Amino acid sequence: MCRYILFTLLTIVTFSVSFSQSDHVAIKWNEQVLEAIRNDYARPTVHARNLMHSSAIMYDCWAAYDTTSSEHYFLGNTIGSFTSVFDFENFEPNIPSNSLEKMKAQEVSMSYGVYRLIKHRYMSSPQWSSTLLNINAQMASQGLDTLIVSTD
């Protein structure tokens, strides 16, 4: 009986956590990257790099708005021969103080970052039109304009 109760509790906790996490924008964009991979040629090395870059983009977009974050991957760093210039001092005053507004800003930032990555990396994919429809629909579901190309 005790095992049954323990199993039931663990199942409930597991599913409640997985359902609540599936609504996060990072999960949704990761699914878009995986779908773009399915719509492309089999190129494991390229796709591994794209997954890493999408994760780094989402992390940096989150970390830019999180004042307790001590490290960034691209922002303000040099990776190989590429330097990403980022002015933390001028950016920090623009971070919303309200936690809900900050979370929304992080989600918007992540969305534009991964949207642009997918557009750039998969435009020569054999099923590019399907991928473009998917990512445009994702942006529309968040109320974001795909025509904005600002780097601010």
Describe the residue ranges of each PLM region.
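Bacterial Sec-dependent N-terminal signal peptides
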Residues: M1-H24
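Acidic/polar surface patches and capping/hinge elements
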Residues: Q21-D152
